[in-house]
């Protein structure tokens, strides 16, 4: 059984954007390392991840929400439809054996916070959580400082500068 990595990120990037290209590279490398991928199923980073995975022989699960309407991106090989945003977030988290958080906005922030809190409160199995982008590095650094002050585990969420570092971390920590 292949492990699945859930990737969170913006719906805004298009194929010519650096964020899209980085997400495509990540999806490709995840697939080449035997991982299926799971995303929110729509466009932008979600499409790029799915495209990279499918073009390299792996499954791309898309967890969509009826509220926004519209079809999943054409690279999704299995769609899971949810009725609400919170149902969708729960399904994205349940499906993942590890998580990657790429550039995004408030929705991506909500997803990161949900994964982090479930891990922090030991409400889910210990799974790797990897962030990419200077924005997340700043946020996770601030939160880790607070975690230290509270005497909590401050190493749950890791920040990385390259896709290669993320892949190495996931391969090592999803065994």
Give the ranges of each region predicted by the language model:
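Short Gly/Thr/Asp-enriched flexible loops that form oxyanion-binding sites at enzyme active sites
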Residues: 47-53, 110-122
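Glycine-rich, charge-decorated loop segments at or immediately adjacent to ligand/cofactor-binding or catalytic sites
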Residues: 44-48, 136-147
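Short, acidic/small-residue loops that bind anionic groups at enzyme active sites
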Residues: 64-66, 102, 118-142, 152-155
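Glycine-rich beta-alpha loop segments
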Residues: 1-61
């Amino acid at each position: 059984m292949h492990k699945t990595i859930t990737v969170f990120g913006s719906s805004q990037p298009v194929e010519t954007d650096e964020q899209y290209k980085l997400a495509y590279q990540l999806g490709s490398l995840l697939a080449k390392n035997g991982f299926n991928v799971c995303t929110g199923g729509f466009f932008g980073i979600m499409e790029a991840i799915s495209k990279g995975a499918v073009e390299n022989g792996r499954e791309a699960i898309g967890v969509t929400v009826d509220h926004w309407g519209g079809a999943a991106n054409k690279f999704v090989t299995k769609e899971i439809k949810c009725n609400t945003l919170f149902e969708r977030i729960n399904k994205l988290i349940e499906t993942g054996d590890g998580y990657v958080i790429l550039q995004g906005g408030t929705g991506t922030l909500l997803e990161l916070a949900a994964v982090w809190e479930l891990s922090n409160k030991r409400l889910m199995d210990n799974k790797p959580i990897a962030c990419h982008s200077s924005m997340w590095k700043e946020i996770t650094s601030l939160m880790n400082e607070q975690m230290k002050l509270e005497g909590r585990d401050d190493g749950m969420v890791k920040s990385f500068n390259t896709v290669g570092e993320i892949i190495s971390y996931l391969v090592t920590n999803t065994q």
